[in-house]
Each structure stands twice: as structure tokens, then as C-alpha cells.
A protein has these predicted regions:
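Short amphipathic alpha-helix segments
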Residues: 127-137
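RNA-binding basic/glycine-rich loop and surface signature characteristic of RAMP-family CRISPR effectors
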Residues: 1-126, 139-220
């Protein structure tokens, strides 16, 4: 089994939706834990990386660099929508020093109630966006929607476990991570730009070298 660390840096405000609102104040809220610290669910990032891996395969095959196939993606990630994957498992992605930070915030919420609350903590990581639906150049009546988004600049990290020790599987995961440029909702409106990578410089370099070597070989 191979253990890797996946990192994501938010290059723009990002909407990792929980599927719920927040009372009558927010129509679409982000995912956060019991003390107000945001995170990226494992299942969400698995789906994004699976789609990114398929895109990598498609682009390489289009360039006649036939190193990976859709079957490789299925073997690594399992069938789309399945709860458990074939060869890979993800942890939720949390901020750095998550457990220590959570313990501090839990203490402050309990002992400094006048200054700290779950709301104040989640507000420190987020901001509010409002938008309306436009119809024929005019704001549509009753279309105002409010959503909470994660602030640009937050970084997340989590463990990735790959059952296969095959170098090609590790290379495809590394390439899929580097290829992933946006996550979350409202990506066509400028949200969700990210930098995603496996925190292993050697693996990333080997993956790129593997592509370049085979590209040169295919050109000869």
C-alpha cells in the first residue's frame, strides 16, 4: 500500500456546498465541522480526481501517448458513485494542524462564549455572496440567493491510500491532482480555482518525466 498526502490551495473564493442552507439567512452553505472549521469531504474530492484522471487519459490518448486507459481509472477509483473504491481511499481534507486547532476552538467556544462561537469561527474562514437571476436584462423577482463561500488562500490536506503498488497508478493519481484546476459550485462564475497536488516532489517529477519520455518515444 502507498500512502500519499494530497494538498489543495484555494486560489479564489470557493463553494464546497453542504447541500443545506443556514436558517433563513443563507440559501447555500459550505461544509464545516461541529466547531465551524471547513473541510472538503473525501467523497467529493474522490469524484473530482476521478473526473480529472479521465481527462488526463483522454488528453494523452488524443496526443497518441497511450499510457493509461479508462479501465485504469476504473480499477483505481472504482465505479462512479460507488461508496468504496477499488484501489484508493481518501480522507477528508482539513486545514493544517486541524486536530490542534479544533481543540483550541472547542475550548474557546466553551470557556469564552462572549467572544467565540461556531458562527464567529466559520465567519473567519468565509464570506457571503449574493446573486440574482437576470431575465431579459432585469433582475427576476424573488430570485435573490445568498451563499457562503470559503475565502481565497485557505489550504487543505489529507491522506490518500492506494492499495496498488504499481508505479503507473501512482503516476496517474499525481497527474490527475496536477490537472485538477477547479472544484465546487459556481465554477463558471469565477469560484473554485485551486492548486492541487500530491505532496511528493519526487513522484510528481517522475510522473511528468514518464509522460515526456513516452511522448518522445512516440514521436520517433
Amino acid at each position: 500500500m502507498t500512502q500519499l498526502k494530497l494538498k489543495i490551495e484555494l486560489l479564489s473564493d470557493t463553494m464546497i456546498g453542504s447541500g443545506d442552507g443556514y436558517g433563513a439567512v443563507i440559501d447555500s452553505d459550505v461544509v464545516y465541522d461541529e466547531v465551524g472549521i471547513p473541510f472538503i469531504p473525501a467523497r467529493r474530492i474522490k469524484g473530482c480526481l476521478r473526473d480529472s484522471a479521465l481527462q488526463v487519459v483522454e488528453r494523452l490518448n488524443f496526443a497518441n501517448i497511450n499510457l493509461f486507459s479508462e479501465d485504469d481509472v476504473k480499477n483505481i477509483f472504482g465505479k462512479k458513485g460507488a461508496k468504496f473504491s477499488a484501489d484508493i481511499r481518501f480522507d477528508n481534507l482539513f486545514i493544517s494542524d486541524y486536530e490542534k486547532t479544533k481543540a483550541v476552538f472547542s475550548y474557546l467556544i466553551k470557556n469564552k462564549k462572549d467572544d467565540f462561537s461556531i458562527d464567529s469561527i466559520i465567519n473567519s474562514f468565509t464570506n457571503i455572496r449574493r446573486n440574482t437571476e437576470i431575465e431579459k436584462g432585469i433582475a427576476k423577482e424573488h430570485s435573490l440567493r445568498t451563499m457562503r463561500v470559503l475565502n481565497k488562500g485557505i489550504s487543505f490536506e489529507g491522506e490518500v491510500a492506494i492499495d496498488s503498488s504499481n508505479d503507473n497508478s501512482n503516476f496517474l493519481i499525481a497527474l490527475a491532482a496536477m490537472n485538477l484546476k477547479r472544484i465546487g459550485s459556481k465554477r463558471t462564475r469565477g469560484l473554485g480555482e485551486i492548486k492541487c497536488y500530491i505532496d511528493d516532489t519526487s513522484l510528481n517529477k517522475k510522473a511528468i518525466d514518464f509522460i515526456e519520455l513516452n511522448a518522445k518515444g512516440g514521436a520517433n
